[in-house]
Amino acid sequence: MATATLAAPAPTLPAAPLSWKFYPLSGMIKAPSGAFLGNGYSGNGQGLNNPAMENVHNIGPIPRGAYYIGDFFDDDGGKGPTVCDLVPCSETETFGRCGFMIHGDNKKANHTASEGCIVAPRFIRDAMKLSPVKLLQVL
């Protein structure tokens, strides 16, 4: 009597890495779980949350793509507590722009603190600091 053998399950593709998500057009920030956390902004003036101006230095929002989230630190120079650098992944087109960060708003809270950085509320920055997920997708 022949014994039936079960076929091994087909290999599955690895899941996409978990990431934080920032949507410049709306300012929406989502946690790696997909949960909406709140809104931030990027860029200023005509470039405020305007992805069509992502190539404009010091005005447009952070360019779409993937970024590594650096270690968080407190910046006494004006960016506030719980600040991090964003390092673009190799496939991200930055249009020659650099120095992107996630930081807090200015004291006026009038959406003028960004020259391309992501400005996010403190509770979101605190959540990012505590998270093991260190990838941000700007969509």
Locations of the language-model features?
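Gly/Pro-biased beta-strand-loop elements
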Residues: 2, 6-98
